[in-house]
């Protein structure tokens, strides 16, 4: 398509081994002001207060696209204000079916102990570590919490730490943020859903 602007992710392929970490924080981008709106205060009816609108949700169906999005948000100085969703078959699923989706066993879902073990390994040893490289700062999710229903299991992680920056530096630029990572699968398929949010505090 002529004249189509390429996104940074298309222009710069993802290379997890050569992403430079963030050394220092910077001021909040000026474009953020367009995301601030006024609403009536629930505490004091008749008065208005300013709130930051939630970031636009970006949807992905490939892990590399999702990781490139996270990397690009850091490069754009929006590392503390984004929301991405990923719907994908994890690498261990693709390997087991030799990249042929028709060969995915119907038993590969949340009811399979092996599938859950492989998914938990993928989350801890690959997904979180790769996201940390893409973010360019420390992620401190810990073990997380597992929430299970009859048809779904979700691993929930939160990071409200300083992400490796000093409190003085965070205060200087007013850059305090928390991260939320939810990874879930169902009893219907091997498809995994990831929801990753960076929220200013």
From Swiss-Prot:
Inducing or repressing factors: Expression is under the control of RAS1. Up-regulated during colonization of the cecum and invasion of host tissue. Down-regulation correlates with clinical development of fluconazole resistance.
Cysteine pairs bridged by disulfides in the record: none
GO cellular component: plasma membrane
GO BP: any one term: energy reserve metabolic process
Region Disordered, annotated ranges: 1-45
InterPro entries linked to this entry: RGI1, RGI1_sf
Keyword Acyltransferase on entry: no
Subcellular localization: Cell membrane
Bias-annotated ranges (Polar residues): 31-40
Keyword NAD among record annotations: no
Spans through the membrane: none
Topology versus the membrane: Peripheral membrane protein
Top-level taxon of origin: Eukaryota
Keywords: Cell membrane, Membrane
Family assignment from sequence similarity: Belongs to the RGI1 family.
Described function: Involved in the control of energetic metabolism and significantly contribute to cell fitness, especially under respiratory growth conditions.
Protein name: Respiratory growth induced protein 1
Species assigned in the record: Candida albicans (strain SC5314 / ATCC MYA-2876) (Yeast)
Gene that produces this protein: RGI1
């Amino acid at each position: 398509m002529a004249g189509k602007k390429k996104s940074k992710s298309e222009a710069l392929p993802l290379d997890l081994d050569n992403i430079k970490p963030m050394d220092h924080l910077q001021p909040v981008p000026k474009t953020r002001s367009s995301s601030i709106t006024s609403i009536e205060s629930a505490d004091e009816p008749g008065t208005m207060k300013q709130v930051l609108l939630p970031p636009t949700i970006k949807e992905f169906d490939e892990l590399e696209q999702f990781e490139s999005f996270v990397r690009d948000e850091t490069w754009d100085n929006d590392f503390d204000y984004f929301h991405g969703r990923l719907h994908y078959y994890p690498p261990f699923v693709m390997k087991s079916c030799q990249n042929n989706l028709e060969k995915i066993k119907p038993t590969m879902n949340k009811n399979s102990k092996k599938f859950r073990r492989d998914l938990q390994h993928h989350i801890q040893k690959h997904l979180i570590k790769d996201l940390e490289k893409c973010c360019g700062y420390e992620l401190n999710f810990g073990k997380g919490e597992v929430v299970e229903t009859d048809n779904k299991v979700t691993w929930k992680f939160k990071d409200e730490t300083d992400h490796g920056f000093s409190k003085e530096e965070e205060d200087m630029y007013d850059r305090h943020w928390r991260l939320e990572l939810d990874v879930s699968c169902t009893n219907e398929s091997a498809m995994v859903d990831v929801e990753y949010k960076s929220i200013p505090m």
